[in-house]
UniProtKB/Swiss-Prot annotation:
<dbReference type="InterPro" id="IPR004276">
    <property type="entry name" value="GlycoTrans_28_N"/>
</dbReference>
<feature type="compositionally biased region" description="Basic and acidic residues">
    <location>
        <begin position="146"/>
        <end position="162"/>
    </location>
</feature>
<feature type="domain" description="PH">
    <location>
        <begin position="238"/>
        <end position="336"/>
    </location>
</feature>
<dbReference type="GO" id="GO:0016126">
    <property type="term" value="P:sterol biosynthetic process"/>
</dbReference>
<dbReference type="InterPro" id="IPR011993">
    <property type="entry name" value="PH-like_dom_sf"/>
</dbReference>
<comment type="similarity">
    <text>Belongs to the glycosyltransferase 28 family.</text>
</comment>
<dbReference type="GO" id="GO:0016906">
    <property type="term" value="F:sterol 3-beta-glucosyltransferase activity"/>
</dbReference>
<feature type="binding site">
    <location>
        <position position="1074"/>
    </location>
    <ligand>
        <name>UDP-alpha-D-glucose</name>
    </ligand>
</feature>
<feature type="binding site">
    <location>
        <position position="1053"/>
    </location>
    <ligand>
        <name>UDP-alpha-D-glucose</name>
    </ligand>
</feature>
<keyword id="KW-0963">Cytoplasm</keyword>
<dbReference type="Pfam" id="PF00169">
    <property type="entry name" value="PH"/>
</dbReference>
<keyword id="KW-1207">Sterol metabolism</keyword>
<feature type="compositionally biased region" description="Polar residues">
    <location>
        <begin position="452"/>
        <end position="461"/>
    </location>
</feature>
<feature type="compositionally biased region" description="Low complexity">
    <location>
        <begin position="52"/>
        <end position="67"/>
    </location>
</feature>
<feature type="binding site">
    <location>
        <position position="749"/>
    </location>
    <ligand>
        <name>UDP-alpha-D-glucose</name>
    </ligand>
</feature>
<feature type="binding site">
    <location>
        <position position="1054"/>
    </location>
    <ligand>
        <name>UDP-alpha-D-glucose</name>
    </ligand>
</feature>
<dbReference type="InterPro" id="IPR050426">
    <property type="entry name" value="Glycosyltransferase_28"/>
</dbReference>
Amino acid sequence: MPITQIISASDSEAGPKPSISLVPDKPSEPETSPRHHRLSRSLSKFKRWRGRSNSSLSMGSSEQQELQDSPNEARSDDDENGYNNDNADDLAKSKYMMKSIAGLLTTASVYAGMNNAQEMNVLSQVDSEESDSSDSFQENIGQNEVKSKKENLKTKSHPEVPRLDKRKPTLFDFSITREKLSKDNVAKLRQRFCLDEQEPFLNDFPAWLLKDVLVQGHIFITTKHFLFFAYLPKNPRSVKMSGNLNIRTKLIRSTRYWCVLKNHLFSMYTSSTELYFPVLTIDLREVQKIETQKHTLNGSATKTFKLYTDESTFKFNADSEFSAKSWVNALKKEQFAAQNSENNSISLKIPLPNIIEIDDQPIVNKALTLRLRALESSQTYAIDDFMFVFMDGSGSQVKESLGEQLAILQKSGVNTLYYDIPAKKSKSSFGKETPATAEQKNNGEDSKYLNVPTSAVPSSENGKKSRFRFRERSNSWFRRAKPLEDSQVEDVEEIYKDAANDIDSSVHSTIHIHEQEDSQEQTVAWKPSHLKNFAEMWAAKPIHYRNKFIPFQKDDTYLIKETEEVSANERFRYHFKFNKEKSLISTYYTYLNRNVPVYGKIYVSNDTVCFRSLLPGSNTYMVLPLVDVETCYKEKGFRFGYFVLVIVIHGHEELFFEFSTEVARDDIERILLKLLDNIYASSAEGSNISSASLGDVQHNPDSAKLKLFEDKINAEGFEVPLMIDENPHYKTSIKPNKSYKFGLLTIGSRGDVQPYIALGKGLIKEGHQVVIITHSEFRDFVESHGIQFEEIAGNPVELMSLMVENESMNVKMLREASSKFRGWIDALLQTSWEVCNRRKFDILIESPSAMVGIHIAEALQIPYFRAFTMPWTRTRAYPHAFIVPDQKRGGNYNYLTHVLFENVFWKGISGQVNKWRVETLGLGKTNLFLLQQNNVPFLYNVSPTIFPPSIDFSEWVRVTGYWFLDDKSTFKPPAELQEFISEARSKGKKLVYIGFGSIVVSNAKEMTEALVEAVMEADVYCILNKGWSERLGDKAAKKTEVDLPRNILNIGNVPHDWLFPQVDAAVHHGGSGTTGASLRAGLPTVIKPFFGDQFFYAGRVEDIGVGIALKKLNAQTLADALKVATTNKIMKDRAGLIKKKISKEDGIKTAISAIYNELEYARSVTLSRVKTPRKKEENVDATKLTPAETTDEGWTMI
């Protein structure tokens, strides 16, 4: 029974009014949309038959409304089509009061918890004491219990768990498997560095260049040069990182935004579903500094970090120190790439004679640093320092190779600055050229070297004071505020080579010139002609720009002058932080109609449509990639004398723009349609093109491993982000030195176990060991996929049978529920601990309904994750899956449902859990405050298209996508089924699937008759999976009570991934897995929920416009729903769009990436819960251990 039925009566059941009233917020005003033809008119019809006056078809729009205090308008009870008529009978009404597994557990736990009132009172006193002093709790709580159970602990036969102080940390080993330099690669390097054909390559070494970031690349040593080259991460369209952050300001203490880091732009949005309207965008090319704020007392990192620009300072608050560090690392990488790279690469070229000093220092194990100092210019005597890190011990070989080649140059008559070479000093004076050898004369540009006496070089070994004063440089080449052009890179490289003869090519003059140019451009951008602009705004005529995408005629009356074109493009790029790839095609003055019309300017570029408000006090910006636009069309104006253009966006509500002239509206429509035709023509996928602007991070396990690796080296004291070289000839991957042991713990039905099997197979492919811990009935299912299995007690079917026997709540039922639940949970606790303790897992992932994992992880002191299919995290966006109201009640209610469920759930199990913790685990008693459940990393195996991450989700809460377990490759369909499908297709009939699982209803025969009547009236063919019956576990449930007509086939269980692509619509109970399978196949979905999270997913399917939520099921309501699901084109198209989005998700890979990303954070959360040791003599202060001291795993860079 859902917890809703504990506190209120369900609409589907007769009963008194709720005894507990959860006061909703004030209802919000319904949204009004203009009436228009084509798609919009169909959409308005679609909204009406869905029974909502204010529900938008845009994905995630309802969530944004729910984040506000005002809830959406409730679903209408009066339905035009009649399939949700409250006066109709519900033949699928459950016969029994208790209907949900989680509801069963919760309800039974309440009854069992009533017997532990005295223990709860004691624990509530602990709660109040904890709020005053957590330290006193740590010292006092649980000591008496540990002492009293000391003898019992000694008699336990469980193996001892190795404590953290006894685990030996493994140092990191690095190696890179690379191919030998081919002739093509050598030729490319010669071209890149402008090397002579007669200058051979001597050696190459993998190395890391240490700047603000640690850049992985390669060192090449030739006969005359020291070269470093690195490919920076490519794919500028991908989102590097996204998540929620709080921005602190002076006026407003803190505001929470959805933040997206993409290429050189760091953008903030109001929610994860409104990604075309940034609230703030920071250009990382203009950022001067990024730093984590430190504690003033101990200097440790905080959750706050800052971004400094020339104009302002931005202060951000993350959800944890780990999250703040992750954001800082990601931002520093993109800042470095934006400010220091050209063509996605970094190159460094130093003539060997300019090298002054080479110093190597060991770090840990084989790793060492190599400091290289080189003279930059004879005019300034500036010396550049370059620091390289070698992880495989090759740094000493680099030093040796450089020393040998410098000695060869010295012997050949070339004066060098390297003081370690015992060579004769040149007799020629400083500043004159050394006589060149024949080889040098042939080499042209490399034949001139600075003739500097080695005594002039500052050295610790040189006893005499130098006559020359060298000025230290801070590597300005890497710290330029603007990206370098190719010519500038070359100038910088030439400084090391011919600085004495080419003073005009110095770094200083180059930067100085560009600073002047930038300031001039900004001055031009902010000197508009006010009278002219006012006239243009009043006339509202189109403005065309010369471009190579949409050619305009020379006599075009709207074509702008060439003298104004450059400044217009510069202003456009300045406003929206674009690079030079963006070029304007046309601009218009218009109104953007959302909630309130906003006057501004719309910009059309080669691949983007942008809007900027022009009204004082308004700060509306829009950046819409054209690849996300489906089409656009003309519409009548909302006001007299105005003309509307409607832009239709994939998976988003339409945008309406009002123009004061018909000419401007028609002109932009023509240009947009032409650009869309060009985009679709250039892609083989046509309208399937998608944009990374939708904010979906491309989760790559290698990137996640890199983040974990960064966390570990940060713990070693190296707080610097890593940038992996993406050289196609040197493939880099990160793998653990040891295989992790994953324990996946879950209880429930097949739908709860199946996603864990899919995740387990993915982890095994990563090289880890996986054990699934669940009930014995799933042993064959788990082991058939090659995954190890461990059995535990706690099968909820035992409790369900008790609820089935009692149709109403009575004293007998309460007593039996209490006694059986206590024994049930005792067995679950004990068997789960025995398995996990014996297996010695490294990481534990648990379904939170299993209740035991968080305590076992604390006892074993291992990272702990939660994974589930329904809302379990406190949020204002969604109610708890077991307390879904009949109408939307707003954010306050949603948040309250989570708090209520947590307290009710814990109240029922806390007595037994605390006793088990003390007697078996050797831990102290705990409570909700000490458990820190909201800080546990959480993985939702649901698609973000149906469950968009809420703006108030913490950084460690990830919506990964579905974990599909594909069985279609091994399934062989029966001939009867194939013939039935062929018959339906040959007759042109729609084919639907109907199945509700193994539910218990009041009258199974009447329900079957109603289903047959509905299928006949809808005139469709039906593949039936009958599982309903009047008794739990009825063996005859699969058989039909009535004769089925020819157009209905009862086939039983068929893999959804095979069957659903064969049908046109699906009708089911709304379980997470079944809903995911139907949406994955692009099917309009009709859901008749029965219990638990099924009500939640029924509402979500209806919210995003791909299905219908049936309140009651009978012949008429089901027939009406089937007609709509099989004939409505808008719903079919919407379902097809969802299919495309889900097909591009990889839930398993994203989940594995999230595990790597949050592994160190999960470990820290577990350690923070450790309050008392398992045994008194093993008193280990685990809270003081560093992450490096609490792990025994290592990682290898391959």
